[in-house]
Amino acid sequence: VILRGGSEAINTNLSLSKLIQKSLITNSVDPHSVQIISDTSRDLVTELVTTDKYIDLIIPRGSKELLRFLKAHSKIPMIKHLDGNCHVFIDEFADLAKALKIAINSKTNRFGVCNAAETLIVSKGIACEFVPKVVNELSKKNVTVRGCDQTNKMVSNIETASEADWHEEYLGPILAIKIVSGIDEAIDHINHYGSHHTDAIVSESKKNQNIFTQAVDSSSVIINASTRFADGFEYGLGAEIGISTDKIHARGPVGLEGLTSLRWVVSGCLLYTSDAADDRCC
């Protein structure tokens, strides 16, 4: 394992690496099995990500700029932890008391995390009743609301959402609200603007729950629960290195199991394949 951090935390990283290596020695593991690179220059990263002869996998954690750089230069496969533009969809068949608690928790439990909700989507059938209530609760939490045109007609003193807002991972006390005609438009919005991270539906309709889970192309799809449950510990995976939005190998919260692969061992007693192409017996 090779660890390479940024210049802003190099002293902390060096101290942590000493603790890791001390722990490895205590447990009779080669201390060189975990190494840290003290050089924080970008040139070294460019060189490192082309050494596919020696490195099997890169797990980048950082800015969008870092991920774009690695995508352009790396010759090594990556498990990427990208944006968390997460949505909560309040279906027309939702229990609105549940919906209010789920929406508020998804947004305000912690702002600066990747599984916090950034857009609330509300079916027009219950919007007139639900939207004013949720905006009122959000205001108590000092959350700025940016709404679509229909939202602005229902409540006052909120900002108007722009096209950019639907793409945005705010990581702060801002929430966009979109009113849609129904579940189909909600799914289209999520698949178009979302980051395939975590998206939730609040609904008492089993039919709509199934439609949503089948059609929303995200690593975690949640029914009647907060988006904050998209987490390695909550899924029983233990500590995670990130939440992958890729579709190859590990997807969603990536723990130790997600970093492993299979190796097949065949044990026999004079087992051999037949020479005949149509004979599959050993």
Residue spans for each PLM region:
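Short beta-strand-to-turn element immediately C-terminal to the catalytic PLP-Schiff-base lysine
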Residues: 89-92, 121-124, 180, 202-204, ...
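Conserved small/polar residues in nucleotide/adenosyl-binding loops
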Residues: 272-277
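C-terminal core of ALDH-fold dehydrogenases
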Residues: 183, 188-271
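Flexible, glycine/charged-enriched surface loops at secondary-structure junctions
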Residues: 28-34, 111-116, 144-150, 198-204, ...
